[in-house]
């Protein structure tokens, strides 16, 4: 695979290899055959970041080869959304011959939605001033004249200039209902939107008919907790990043959901609060004991669950675990399988043509 060529003819083979690999990894814990969810074979990534290389009068996107660290010029990127590909061409054309926008520009980040909105961030090794803003506004207006629904942001050390806004609103059809998700620049969002829809629908399917409330750790912008709210009496969710919490609160209102409560705290802190080890001012007005959480949802970082959180989740009858790293999932399962058994197993091909796998398991108490 090269940045400008996807081996789409190998899609089925690479997916089959992942299924075999996941089954092998999960063998100590389950003999289930994974439910497999395919990605689009191209244009599946909704965000991308590129370094910018200055070559005399020329200017272009590059990425670095992971093995050799050599530069690779990238003029098109079929893994990314069609909108990102349009913007890559338009941004280079708009910046190449503009000294103010070009000088000391070292990176461009793209974030797009299925609803065809985009935020493009230009990163600089220089101070950004009013002259930069004027030129950036002219570029933005020129892009919009090409029917590109784009917002531009300038970033430099301790500086962030938003010409309009630093977010876009995604609209996803999830099990017969449109979900609105505000996505903030420089915050985590699911990179493969088509795959995200399938993950949300799978999570809804495995939790249908649920009793009681749902607890979610690491909720981000509310991606899962808001979609799953229809299956539970109430949802209590934690997140540490301020922009994500703000986006989650917006998403609750935008989707007219009234049974989700977001708390800004780390999973480790929440564990302490639930166990009565510490009291937190930010929990004032929230009666944790009133929640009857029979299901806990976790979507941890690549490092998986820490030991304390492992112990905490074992107290719940059902654990729904989405993993972006099956190796750490299996490490966690060494502990979790002492009290729970795997009921459902899914493979989500979030990152086609790479060794990365995303998977989901539903665990129920033995």
From Swiss-Prot:
Q: What does the record list as coiled-coil region(s)?
A: none
GO biological process: what's one of them?
tRNA methylation
Ligand binding (S-adenosyl-L-methionine) = 190, 218, 223, 239, 299
User: What is the organism of origin for this protein?
Assistant: Escherichia coli (strain SMS-3-5 / SECEC)
Record-given protein name: tRNA/tmRNA (uracil-C(5))-methyltransferase
Q: Which UniProt keywords apply?
A: Methyltransferase, S-adenosyl-L-methionine, Transferase, tRNA processing
Does Transferase count among this protein's keywords?
yes
List the cysteine pairs that form cystine.
Answer: none
Entry EC number(s): 2.1.1.-, 2.1.1.35
Q: Which Pfam family is one of those matched by this entry?
A: tRNA_U5-meth_tr
Q: What does this protein do?
A: Dual-specificity methyltransferase that catalyzes the formation of 5-methyluridine at position 54 (m5U54) in all tRNAs, and that of position 341 (m5U341) in tmRNA (transfer-mRNA).
Name the family the entry cites: Belongs to the class I-like SAM-binding methyltransferase superfamily. RNA M5U methyltransferase family. TrmA subfamily.
| An annotated Gene Ontology molecular function | tRNA (uracil(54)-C5)-methyltransferase activity, S-adenosyl methionine-dependent
Residue numbers annotated as active site: 324 (nucleophile), 358 (proton acceptor)
């Amino acid at each position: 695979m090269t940045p400008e060529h996807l081996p789409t003819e190998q899609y089925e083979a690479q997916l089959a290899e992942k299924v075999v690999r996941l089954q092998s990894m999960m063998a100590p814990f389950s003999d289930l055959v994974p439910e497999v969810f395919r990605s689009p074979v191209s244009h599946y990534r909704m965000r991308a970041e590129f370094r910018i290389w200055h070559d005399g009068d020329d200017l272009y996107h590059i990425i670095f080869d992971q093995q050799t660290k050599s530069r690779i010029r990238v003029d098109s990127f079929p893994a990314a959304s069609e909108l990102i590909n349009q913007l890559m061409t338009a941004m280079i054309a708009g910046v190449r011959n503009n000294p103010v926008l070009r000088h000391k520009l070292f990176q461009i980040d793209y974030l797009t939605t299925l609803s065809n909105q985009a935020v493009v961030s230009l990163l600089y090794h220089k101070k950004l001033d009013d002259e930069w803003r004027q030129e950036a506004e002219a570029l933005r207006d020129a892009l919009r004249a090409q029917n590109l629904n784009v917002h531009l942001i300038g970033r430099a050390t301790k500086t962030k200039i938003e010409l309009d806004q630093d977010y876009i609103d995604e609209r996803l059809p999830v099990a017969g209902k449109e979900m609105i998700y505000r996505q903030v620049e420089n915050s985590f969002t699911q990179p493969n939107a088509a795959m995200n829809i399938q993950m949300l629908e799978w999570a809804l399917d495995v939790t249908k008919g649920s009793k009681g409330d749902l607890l979610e750790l690491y909720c981000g912008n509310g991606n899962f907790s808001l979609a799953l709210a229809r299956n539970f009496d109430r949802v209590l969710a934690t997140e540490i990043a301020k922009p994500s919490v703000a986006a989650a609160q917006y998403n609750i209102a935008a989707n007219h959901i009234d049974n989700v409560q977001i708390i800004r705290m780390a999973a480790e802190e929440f564990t302490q609060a639930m166990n009565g080890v510490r009291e937190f001012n930010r929990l004032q007005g929230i009666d944790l004991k009133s929640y009857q959480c029979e299901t806990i949802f976790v979507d941890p970082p690549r490092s998986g669950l820490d030991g304390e959180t492992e112990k905490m989740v074992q107290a719940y009858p059902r654990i729904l675990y989405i993993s972006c790293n099956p190796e750490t999932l299996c490490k966690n399962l060494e502990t979790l399988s002492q009290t729970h058994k795997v009921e459902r197993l899914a493979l989500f091909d979030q990152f086609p043509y790479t060794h990365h796998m995303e998977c989901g398991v539903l665990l129920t108490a033995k």
